[in-house]
Curated annotation (Swiss-Prot):
Protein name in UniProt: Urease accessory protein UreD 1
InterPro entries xref list: UreD
UniProtKB keywords: Chaperone, Cytoplasm, Nickel insertion
Location of this chain's protein in the cell: Cytoplasm
Assembly: UreD, UreF and UreG form a complex that acts as a GTP-hydrolysis-dependent molecular chaperone, activating the urease apoprotein by helping to assemble the nickel containing metallocenter of UreC. The UreE protein probably delivers the nickel.
Gene: ureD1
Length: 255
């Protein structure tokens, strides 16, 4: 004899955030405390590793479109380690006069670590996106983030995007950036982006990676560093960012 069937999971509402929360128990085992799908992304566990959890952020619908509000909340508990994997990039399509938002909030507890290997974020012609990343790191917490912003699909000039990044370490500002690329005429000026339509970066927060100097590396006022590259095409930049990200990840493993 069986009981009543388990209730079906409630479908995500348009404003529901995707939630990923991981922790490490007293035995050292990593646990996913919460994996909640949102309106646009569903967290899916990958094959486990002994020293971390690996979670894929899988797209569940097309987007971004006008009026969309993608929200992501990630928390890493004390001493825990999380790898976020994006199987594919994200495209903001023609908004036809509207706007959309992409917002991520990251909280990393003492001794926690997050490695986020982001895939390209494409802002198609006609899109207008507000993109916000807020990161809070406790003492001893670390984050490695790879990010690629592409202005336009092939043959397009690209839409409008404004990205704001704010990171705090031990209660103090570590990185505050406001990158306003909403006016194509201004962003294409010499000294801004010029002819480049791809902006790629690797950012380390909570630690300052050692190793050979990079001509486009900026060391932050606290424990952190960033390398940012500009290009007209993606392959060469992606190869350089991949190599740099892997080097910094390896250095982080041995820190």
């Amino acid at each position: 004899m069986t009981g009543p069937p388990a209730p079906a999971a409630r479908p995500a509402e348009p404003d529901d955030p995707t939630v990923v929360a991981v922790e490490r128990d007293a035995s050292g085992r990593h646990l996913a405390r919460e994996l909640s799908p949102g309106a646009f992304l569903a967290p899916r566990p990958l094959l486990p590793c002994a020293d971390r959890l690996r979670i894929a952020l899988v797209g569940t619908r097309a987007g971004l479109l006008a009026g969309d509000d993608l929200r992501l909340h990630v928390s890493v508990g004390p001493g825990a380690r999380l790898d976020l994997v994006e199987p594919s990039g994200l495209v903001a399509y023609d908004h036809r006069g509207g706007r959309s938002a992409w917002r991520a909030r990251i909280d990393i507890a003492a001794g926690g670590r997050l490695d986020w290997d982001g895939k390209p974020f494409v802002v198609a012609h006609g899109a207008w996106v507000d993109r916000t990343m807020e990161v809070t790191l406790a003492p001893g917490a670390r984050m490695l983030w790879r990010d690629t912003l592409v202005l336009g699909r092939s043959g397009e000039r690209g839409g409008r995007v404004r990205t704001r990044t704010r990171a705090e370490y031990d209660g103090r500002e570590l990185l505050v950036e406001d990158l306003d690329l909403t006016d194509p005429d201004i962003r294409e000026l010499p000294g801004v982006l010029g002819p480049n339509r791809i902006v790629g970066s690797v950012t380390a927060l909570g630690t300052r990676p050692p190793g050979p100097p990079h001509p486009y590396r900026t060391d932050l006022a606290g424990p952190g560093a960033q390398v940012r590259l500009l290009d007209t095409e993606a392959p060469a930049m992606e190869a350089e960012l991949s190599a740099l990200c892997e080097h910094w990840r390896t250095e982080n493993d041995h820190a």
